[in-house]
Amino acid sequence: MYNKVIIIGNLTRDVELRYLPSGSALATIGLASNRRFKKQDGSQGEEVCFIDVKLFGRSAEVANQYLRKGSKILIEGRLSLESWNDQSGAKRSRHTITAESMQMLDSKPSGDENPYNNTNASNTGMQHNTNNSPNYNQTHSQPQGNGNIGTGNYPQNIPEINIDDEDIPF
């Protein structure tokens, strides 16, 4: 089955960072995502979804270094169900997201202080990708731009290529 979650929201608390016995970093964050909609009576409604997110490796360390309560981020990952027994013996469960990539959406702060120094950050944020292995992490910077999809330094006059569909190998 396909399990993919993409969510944008704001941190509900500061990042909680700890290290696993293997030495890999694990960060837990709370995320709130708002949805505004029009009710049947025409008034505006809003619902908020709260969910915990787990980040591993370098992404966890970057989140701890740069994110604070209220920071806006985009998370791509997979939905997980955690189950446990509480102190009274009752079975409890909750959904969490295990992050595979994180993108900071807040712009750089103005003034002399720049917490993004010595990183691959741009005005639109920073993106970190991780796979499930704590020992394998990749960092990619996002291209410079105004953050809108479909913009950038792309050629304007792209010639049309005449290829028969049977020549395409897939």
Swiss-Prot record:
GO molecular function, one term: single-stranded DNA binding
Stretches assigned to the SSB domain: 1-106
Biased composition (Polar residues): 88-101, 115-156
Positions occupied by motif Important for interaction with partner proteins: 165-170
UniProt keyword Nucleotide-binding, yes or no: no
Keywords: DNA damage, DNA recombination, DNA repair, DNA replication, DNA-binding
PROSITE patterns (UniProt xref): SSB
SUPFAM superfamilies in UniProt: Nucleic acid-binding proteins (SSF50249)
Record CDD domains: SSB_OBF (cd04496)
Pfam family, one: SSB
GO cellular component: nucleoid
Keyword Ribonucleoprotein attributed: no
UniProt region (Disordered), positions on chain: 88-170
One of the GO biological process terms: DNA repair
Role according to the record: Plays an important role in DNA replication, recombination and repair. Binds to ssDNA and to an array of partner proteins to recruit them to their sites of action during DNA metabolism.
UniProt-listed HAMAP family: SSB
Assembly and interaction partners: Homotetramer.
Protein name (record): Single-stranded DNA-binding protein
Protein source organism: Helicobacter hepaticus (strain ATCC 51449 / 3B1)
Gene: ssb
